[in-house]
Amino acid sequence: MNIRPLQDRVLVRRAEEEKKSAGGIILTGNAQEKPSQGEVVAVGNGKKLDNGTTLPMDVKVGDKVLFGKYSGSEVKVGDETLLMMREEDIMGIIA
């Protein structure tokens, strides 16, 4: 199944979760903190403005991005869980 985000929405694949803490302790289940970065896998056409024009997207497919801990909604695509969020929920692009 393919998903094409609409308007200013972005589909993000979350980065892999850390299996060990900074101190070397192996984390299991709920102890693992979900990373707040990922890779953009699809983008919409841009935000529709009141005057009818479309504001183009700043992010593009393949960008590594940072986002808030509670940003986006989880979406199941095949056997993978992705995040759908608005572009404004993205805090930055990792260079």
UniProtKB/Swiss-Prot annotation:
Molecular function GO terms recorded: ATP binding; metal ion binding; protein folding chaperone; protein-folding chaperone binding; unfolded protein binding
SMART domains according to UniProt: Cpn10 (SM00883)
Gene Ontology CC annotations of this record: cytoplasm
Main location: cytoplasm
Signal peptide: none
InterPro entries on file: Chaperonin_GroES, Chaperonin_GroES_sf, Chaprnonin_Cpn10_CS, GroES-like_sf
One Gene Ontology term from the biological process aspect of the record: chaperone cofactor-dependent protein refolding
Family annotation (SUPFAM superfamilies): GroES-like
Keywords recorded for this protein, A-Z: Chaperone, Cytoplasm
Subcellular location field: Cytoplasm
Superkingdom as given in the UniProt entry: Bacteria
Annotated function: Together with the chaperonin GroEL, plays an essential role in assisting protein folding. The GroEL-GroES system forms a nano-cage that allows encapsulation of the non-native substrate proteins and provides a physical environment optimized to promote and accelerate protein folding. GroES binds to the apical surface of the GroEL ring, thereby capping the opening of the GroEL channel.
Subunit comment: Heptamer of 7 subunits arranged in a ring. Interacts with the chaperonin GroEL.
Family: Belongs to the GroES chaperonin family.
UniProt-recorded name of the protein: Co-chaperonin GroES
UniProt source species: Francisella tularensis subsp. holarctica (strain LVS)
